């Protein structure tokens, strides 16, 4: 999921101290592309071969515990160097600048978090430079990336809408919240709305911008409850939507009477499901799309599966164009399987 607020200054300090990113020497450059090749290939692999992840908000627990952990573990297993770069806060312009700063060093591959459509031009530059480039998490249209691997947000919204209709018996007032304007979440909102359309007695109150902030989500939820005392359900689309909605529902003493669904399956979300405050979670397979995305870069670099005499010269990209990794559905019946 995309951008999420850190809960406390103390946790931020602890996290930063625990998340030392590997050093990177910008003077180290990989081989340039053969003028006849569309991307750089290599017959050999070494510990100095560098794969770079470029994200934003690099200290977010969701990213640190899933994406970055999986990427680092993949590098250790494969015997190559992995580097994680990006701003500490949610800062798309700095993510773009980071991508552009990395390109001249020609790493073996770029794994880029699809945070915002605005990063498309920087991705196109990386591809034009012959760097194997995979976008993960959310698709970036017009980026010319070699591969996208991640979640189908429309489907995540549809799953929430279907479960909400089931929880409410097909009737009642509902609202959604997340980060307005982000392509993935807007797709999620559409999926939710399409799922409840067959139920004329379900009244859609609209979508609200919680800015991925727990306090903002709680305030919006409280305002919705105040303005609509008969509200029956709320659905969340960023990692902090669920905890914020849950806080408001608990404070209003409406647990079990206002049904909640949301994305992500962090420990806080799981505990709220176990406590009966949140009814349903749609989790992403973050470790899967990160590790597979990195492996696709390696396979492209080393021609693991050749589709022609020389894929780079033939203009053939020997990895999947698009991979949807699916979702994980969690409720009271299986939540115990996810609590560590």
Show where each model-derived region lies.
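C-terminal motif of bacterial Sec signal peptides marking the signal peptidase cleavage site
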Residues: 16-18
């Amino acid at each position: 999921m995309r951008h999420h607020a850190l809960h406390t200054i103390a946790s931020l300090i602890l996290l930063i101290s625990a998340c030392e990113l590997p050093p990177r020497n910008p003077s180290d450059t990989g081989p340039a592309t053969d003028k006849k090749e569309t991307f750089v290939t290599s017959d050999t692999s070494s510990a100095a071969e560098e794969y770079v992840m470029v994200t934003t908000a690099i200290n977010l627990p969701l990213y640190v515990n899933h994406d970055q952990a999986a990427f680092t573990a993949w590098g250790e297993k494969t015997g190559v160097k992995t580097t994680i770069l990006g701003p500490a806060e949610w800062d798309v312009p700095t993510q773009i600048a980071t991508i552009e700063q990395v390109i001249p060093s020609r790493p073996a591959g770029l794994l880029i978090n699809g945070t915002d459509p605005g990063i498309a031009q920087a991705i196109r530059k990386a591809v034009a430079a012959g760097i194997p480039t995979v976008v993960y998490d959310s698709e970036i249209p017009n980026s010319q990336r070699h591969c996208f691997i991640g979640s189908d947000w429309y489907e995540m919204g549809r799953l929430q809408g279907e479960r909400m209709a089931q929880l409410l018996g097909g009737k009642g007032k509902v609202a959604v919240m997340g980060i307005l304007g982000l392509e993935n979440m807007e797709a999620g909102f559409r999926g939710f709305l399409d799922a409840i359309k067959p139920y004329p007695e379900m009244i859609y109150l609209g979508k609200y911008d919680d800015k991925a902030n727990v306090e903002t989500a709680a305030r919006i939820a409280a305002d919705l409850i105040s303005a609509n005392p008969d509200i029956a359900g709320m659905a969340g689309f960023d990692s902090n939507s669920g905890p914020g909605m849950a806080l408001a529902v608990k404070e209003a003493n409406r647990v079990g009477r206002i049904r909640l669904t949301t994305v992500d399956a962090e420990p806080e979300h799981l505990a709220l499901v176990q406590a009966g405050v949140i009814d349903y979670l749609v989790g992403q397979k973050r470790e899967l799309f990160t590790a597979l995305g990195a492996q696709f870069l390696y396979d492209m670099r080393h021609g693991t599966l050749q589709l022609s005499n020389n894929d780079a010269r033939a203009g053939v990209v020997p990895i999947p164009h698009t991979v949807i990794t699916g979702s994980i559905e969690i409720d009271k019946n299986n939540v115990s399987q996810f609590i560590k």
